[in-house]
């Protein structure tokens, strides 16, 4: 057992060095990845303004006015929310706005009846919770010398909920194919995701998952290789940016750590 433990220790040291060197840019990169799907969708609402209005009118029979309101709310809500998150301005309001958009689209596009897309939306909500937790941590750091008994509890539970919800994204990536590579990929990914949820070796597990998801995303969702006239391009593009947002959530875990409700934190107390 000493060899695996030594190997894990060395890997953790390498991961810590990577995190230390990138600590100044990591939160910004995490936020940028996290808002990617919202920014892309908000931009699509602008570019495909007429198509989106017609789709909503045909799907729900709600009339031109309500269809226009839906598209406008999605456009302004997502682009505005993204701008506020990146500027770190009223982050709680920005997260609430983006959360509302996720719920609105879940109902409007009948995602409730599509289990895979529903899980991905849960993962997005998890990523948003981690942004909110980061904002709480930054707020506390301004009053570092002031006692804050019990004030960290909401933040800790946000981080726990964020970790659990992010796991739903990986569930959608599990493919039940009879190939050695696919089975190995599913097993390794599942183990890493369980470790992230439990908060054990969290930063290392999340960092490896970031690398794994990035490779899978570039391989499976290479939308730029598909001609623009093919519907598959839009589907892969949607998939690509949603996965990128979850990668942003994992990077946020790498930056913040697992929080108080985790095995890593309990180990420190032991």
From Swiss-Prot:
The chain crosses the membrane at residues 65-85, 93-113, 115-135, 178-198, 206-226, 243-263. A motif (Di-lysine motif) lies at residues 267-270. GO terms for biological process: Golgi organization; protein transport. It is found in: Endoplasmic reticulum membrane. GO terms for cellular component: endomembrane system; endoplasmic reticulum; endoplasmic reticulum membrane; endoplasmic reticulum-Golgi intermediate compartment; fusome. It holds the Pfam family SURF4. The di-lysine motif confers endoplasmic reticulum localization for type I membrane proteins. Belongs to the SURF4 family. This is Surfeit locus protein 4 homolog. It comes from Drosophila melanogaster (Fruit fly). The gene is Surf4.
């Amino acid at each position: 057992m000493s060899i695996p433990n030594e190997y894990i220790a060395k890997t953790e040291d390498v991961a810590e060095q990577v995190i230390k060197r990138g600590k100044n840019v990591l939160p910004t990169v995490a936020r940028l990845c996290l808002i990617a799907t919202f920014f892309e969708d908000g931009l699509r609402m602008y570019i495909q303004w007429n198509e989106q209005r017609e789709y909503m009118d045909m799907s729900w029979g709600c009339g031109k006015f309500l269809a226009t309101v839906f598209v406008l709310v999605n456009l302004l809500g997502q682009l505005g929310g993204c701008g506020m998150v990146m500027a770190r301005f009223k982050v709680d309001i920005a997260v609430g706005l983006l959360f509302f958009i996720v719920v609105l689209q879940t109902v409007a596009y009948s995602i409730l009846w599509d289990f895979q897309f529903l899980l991905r939306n849960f993962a997005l909500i998890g990523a948003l919770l981690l942004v909110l937790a980061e904002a709480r941590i930054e707020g506390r750091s301004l009053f570092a010398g002031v006692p804050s008994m019990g004030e960290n509890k909401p933040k800790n539970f946000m981080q726990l909920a964020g970790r659990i919800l992010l796991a739903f994204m990986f569930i959608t990536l599990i493919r039940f194919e009879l190939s050695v590579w696919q089975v190995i990929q599913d097993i390794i990914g599942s183990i890493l995701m369980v470790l992230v949820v439990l908060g054990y070796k969290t930063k290392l597990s999340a960092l490896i998952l970031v690398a794994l998801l990035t490779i899978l995303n570039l391989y499976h969702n290479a939308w730029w290789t598909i001609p623009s006239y093919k519907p598959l391009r839009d589907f892969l593009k949607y998939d690509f940016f949603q996965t990128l947002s979850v990668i942003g959530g994992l990077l946020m875990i790498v930056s913040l750590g697992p929080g108080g409700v985790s095995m890593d934190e309990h180990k420190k107390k032991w």
